[in-house]
Amino acid sequence: RAKALLKNVEVFGVPNLCVLNEDPVGIASRFSGFFDKVLIDAPCSGEGMFRKDNKLIKAWEKNGPEFYSQIQRNIILAGADMLKPGGKLLYSTCTFSKLEDEDSVIHLLTNRPDMHLIDIKPYEGFSHGFDTDEGYHLEKAVRIFPHKMPGEGHFVALFEKDGEDYTSSKRPVSGKTKLPDELKEFMDSTTFEYDPAYINIRDTRVFLTSPYMAEERGLRIIRNGLLLGELKKNRFEPSQAFAMALTKDQFNNCLDLPVSDDRVIR
């Protein structure tokens, strides 16, 4: 899944990325109070997807809400710990299970008193979260039922962390980085903004790493930064990830082709 995630964010054109294959608690220990926003698409029993894929029913019989509940609770606490003061965390599942939905919300609010629920923009067909056995009223959480709006079954809750936001400091770099001529020539042909100090060349591959994300030892990192391309025989060949991150306006020379043009397919 981590490699599929990497492919998706690269095709989407995300320039500032770090993809990990790591336990959330391990990530939280390195990035406490680091992120402005955290999105949790939690692993769940998938009750909301039964209509879409009935194979999930057998998976549910093997590993139901009780199995996933503890995993979700560990993830949501780790997510809150990685959030900056003033930051927002969105917790979502594709299950109807109260144990995995409202009970996970209460687990976070009980164990992290600096987190509170905030409103989600309403849409026609949204339903409120269920009341809990402990007497909590979760009107700000959202349930999506397939008989009330298009789609399957989902649960969403949006949290905010108390305190004032602050800007993370950039990681220090030593000295100036001299870029290979062929790389500099290509970069100069674009208006893409970057700091050469954060260019990292590994063998022939060229990466633009995040100024805020150091190379963390002990973490299973799939990709830290944007793959710009590869140095090949005195030329620089840009990657698809870099091409997707650039807009048309960032090229000094641009050729517009209609969709019907054969050269688009080739």
Q: Positions of the model-derived regions?
A:
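S-adenosyl-L-methionine
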Residues: 1-33
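Short secondary-structure boundary/capping segments
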Residues: 9, 54, 104-107
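Class I S-adenosyl-L-methionine
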Residues: 35, 88-91, 96-205
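Mobile active-site "lid"/loop adjacent to the S-adenosyl-L-methionine
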Residues: 36-77, 94-101
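Helix-to-beta-strand junctions that scaffold the AdoMet/dcAdoMet cofactor pocket
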Residues: 83-85
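Polybasic, low-complexity RNA-engagement segments
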Residues: 152-155, 162-266
